[in-house]
Every structure is written in structure tokens, then in C-alpha cells.
């Protein structure tokens, strides 16, 4: 199979894979090298859905931010949705060891104490407590979920 340079670049710009790491006593977390290459040094960590944290590269955060800005301020759900993601959002930087310092409120929100899973999710990274990851990502009902995705237009 022949791949084009554009396709190779696109693959490099996606976050994929599952990595197990630990948060140290100071709240620092090592970011896998594959993720660091794409994050560079401009990224945002915020509350995510399902009790995890979302990590957006700067450019993806800007796209998300524009979508949030487009929501009507007169809609209460839109305000709550925006508040959920933006109020706790924190710009982060990698230190020389490739770690980030996760603010305590975000660690508490996601229940991050020691063992964590970093999951690449195409345009973002999710940071989960290992326990929540295991609870939320069982494959027991994947056939049902696949059927629902088909209803949304995603067919495998």
C-alpha cells in the first residue's frame, strides 16, 4: 500500500494509543514521547467528559474555543457547557523531563492519585485514573454502541 506524504503527515498529527503512567506526589505526569512531539509546548488541560481530563494542542483548543464562542449566550445549557470546559482550563508546559504539572482541582475532578492512563483520541489526549479507565472502557456492550454509531453515520 502506497501512502502519500500528506497521509503520513496526517497520521503524525493524530493522538493514538494507550499509555500507563503515574502522577508523582507533586502532581507531575510524564507525557509519552509520541504525544510530546505533537503537543510541542502549547497545550491546554481541562475537565473532560466521563470524569477524565482533556488535553488539547493549542491549535485544536482554538478550534474548540471558536465553537464554544459561537454558542448562544441566551441558552442556559450552552453557558453551562462552556463554563465546564473553560473555567477550569489551564495552559500547561512540559518541563525538561517531559512532565506536566496537573493543577490540584483538575486532579481532584478526575480522581487522579497515582496510576493513570493517557489515551490518544485523535485530536486530543484523555487522562484517566486507571480505575475509572477500567470501569468506563469495558467492551461488554461494544456491539450495541457500534449499532448506535451506525445511526450517527459511522459504519465500519
Residue ranges and their predicted role:
Residues 1-21, 25, 35-92, 96, ...:
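Flexible "stalk/tail and boundary" regions
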Amino acid at each position: 500500500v502506497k501512502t502519500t506524504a500528506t497521509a503520513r503527515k496526517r497520521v503524525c498529527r493524530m493522538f493514538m494509543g494507550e499509555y500507563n503512567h503515574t502522577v508523582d506526589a507533586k502532581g507531575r505526569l510524564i507525557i509519552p514521547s509520541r504525544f510530546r512531539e505533537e503537543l510541542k509546548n502549547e497545550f491546554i488541560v481541562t475537565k473532560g467528559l466521563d470524569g477524565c481530563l482533556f488535553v488539547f494542542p493549542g491549535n485544536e483548543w482554538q478550534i474548540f474555543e471558536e465553537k464554544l464562542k459561537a454558542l448562544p449566550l441566551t441558552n442556559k445549557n450552552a453557558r453551562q457547557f462552556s463554563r465546564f470546559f473553560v473555567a477550569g482550563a489551564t495552559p500547561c508546559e512540559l518541563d525538561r523531563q517531559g512532565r506536566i504539572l496537573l493543577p490540584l482541582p483538575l486532579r481532584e475532578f478526575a480522581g487522579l492519585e497515582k496510576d493513570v492512563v493517557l489515551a490518544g483520541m485523535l485530536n486530543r489526549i484523555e487522562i484517566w485514573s486507571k480505575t475509572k479507565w477500567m470501569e468506563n472502557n469495558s467492551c461488554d456492550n461494544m456491539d450495541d454502541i457500534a449499532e448506535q454509531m451506525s445511526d450517527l453515520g459511522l459504519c465500519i
